[in-house]
Amino acid sequence: MAAFALVLVGAGNPAPSLSAYIGKYPSDKVAGISLYNNPKFRILVSGAAPNMSIRTTVLTNGVETPVERQGALLVARVCEPHNCNGHQWTVAILLPNGPAAICYHDGDLMDGDARWFIGGTSIGRSQGCWEGNHTDVPDAVITRLARGH
């Protein structure tokens, strides 16, 4: 019954479009909802993540950069506090409605490489998900997103 009531309350206040977060930090609220809690973002991350552990990590606050627009993509970059070089992730979403790709790097588990995932499947490797201020999403990832996977 509580879930039903929650759906009705949510139906009265639609979540903001993902593009409303561009220029804001992922934890900043737009219409009372952070990017991490935006239902569309959560669904797209769930569809891209290869497992529950990575999905949970990506949907958790960390050290953030402002959400950017890269061409037709919304790009959010986050890392683990005090371990940004060792544990970082990026979410790239083809606006307005997806699909999404996730870059994930855990230096303790991945031998220095980062992996890009779409639809739960690894589609490529890179040196890292982000270095310093900005790293563009690789062209191969953008092409896969544009094709719908």
Which ranges hold each PLM region?
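Bacterial N-terminal signal peptides
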Residues: 1-7
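C-terminal partner/receptor-binding element of secreted or periplasmic proteins
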Residues: 15-30, 35, 39, 108-149
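Short beta-strand segments that buttress and anchor functional surface loops
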Residues: 75-81, 104
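Short, surface-exposed coil-to-beta transition loops
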Residues: 83-90
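Catalytic Cys-His active-site segments of thiol-dependent hydrolases/isopeptidases
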Residues: 101-108
